[in-house]
């Protein structure tokens, strides 16, 4: 039995990135031998075992053969005679197809080190096209490693385009699409996930709501970049620079989906996009099973970002109404999240990336002023029932007016 460290842990170690998970491949063993050695079986579709002490995953070396459509349509073969090289051959990218033995010796049969040095994401073998999930995985790695200068190899992009055209992407489950998108949000450049999917034609299949923003014009006076899709990528980039919150990053990416359904006769204006975007976000989140906390912030940003951009024009009553609609009294963290998205939206415009966003301060001050009005004082003054809320709002408006 020989045990090798494989995949992401080897890659990230060589890139001098933090290693969070370590996966191992076991060559020359069997399920019976693993159990006898004290390992715990956890794999459903193929033999994966947890180490008795570290609890790290150890998989028996295996080969795969395509048997049907989708990313689950594989027959798995594992036996003591499957070699390490055969196991590494089935992996997606050369930089993920390296292994290390217990002496620290690197095993790199497919040029992973070469591609790490060249900063290239390249498929291991033509079998890459058999697994549609790899399109999303490569897009995610492009987002994860873009800050280091990595790009997708032209021939790999061609295979991704082939998968996108084949109809195989439609067989991905909602959960897998969200899982890869969600992982991409934590990257240094989450916008590259969308960009790479767009470049290979996959965005139209997996996230058509975002894909249809490309080619839709906005008024050049406010949006020098004009194209709504390009604006969305720029906003995604700005959001990642402003916040580590995955909720904020997601909401920023989907806040303008309403612009994708504006009738061309109304272009380049999008008067109703804050309203029309709500149903699109709802159905997108339902379709790919986006968690409620992500959906709720996205809806709040979609509904209110235009109002917040006009903060200096709003009456105190309107500011208070916006704060109420954002539910900031019960969810105080919500205002900061929404304002970060709005600032990313404001800066996600060509040539305006460093533009200040005074609207943020205007709304924060309005919130603090309104927060300073205590409901206990209203009750102490003798107000009861519905009159408590009326008087509380009146006093909060006065506090905002006094700024």
Curated annotation (Swiss-Prot):
Residues reported to bind ATP: 8, 11, 91, 137, 140
One of the GO biological process terms: tRNA 3'-terminal CCA addition
SUPFAM superfamilies reported for this sequence: Nucleotidyltransferase, Poly A polymerase C-terminal region-like
InterPro entries associated with the record: CCA_bact, HD/PDEase_dom, HD_domain, NT_sf, PolA_pol_head_dom, PolyA_RNA-bd, tRNA_CCA-adding_enzyme
Domain HD span(s) in chain numbering: 228-329
PROSITE patterns named in the record: HD
Function recorded in the entry: Catalyzes the addition and repair of the essential 3'-terminal CCA sequence in tRNAs without using a nucleic acid template. Adds these three nucleotides in the order of C, C, and A to the tRNA nucleotide-73, using CTP and ATP as substrates and producing inorganic pyrophosphate. tRNA 3'-terminal CCA addition is required both for tRNA processing and repair. Also involved in tRNA surveillance by mediating tandem CCA addition to generate a CCACCA at the 3' terminus of unstable tRNAs. While stable tRNAs receive only 3'-terminal CCA, unstable tRNAs are marked with CCACCA and rapidly degraded.
Domain notes: Comprises two domains: an N-terminal domain containing the nucleotidyltransferase activity and a C-terminal HD domain associated with both phosphodiesterase and phosphatase activities.
Name of the protein in question: Multifunctional CCA protein
Species assigned in the record: Vibrio cholerae serotype O1 (strain ATCC 39315 / El Tor Inaba N16961)
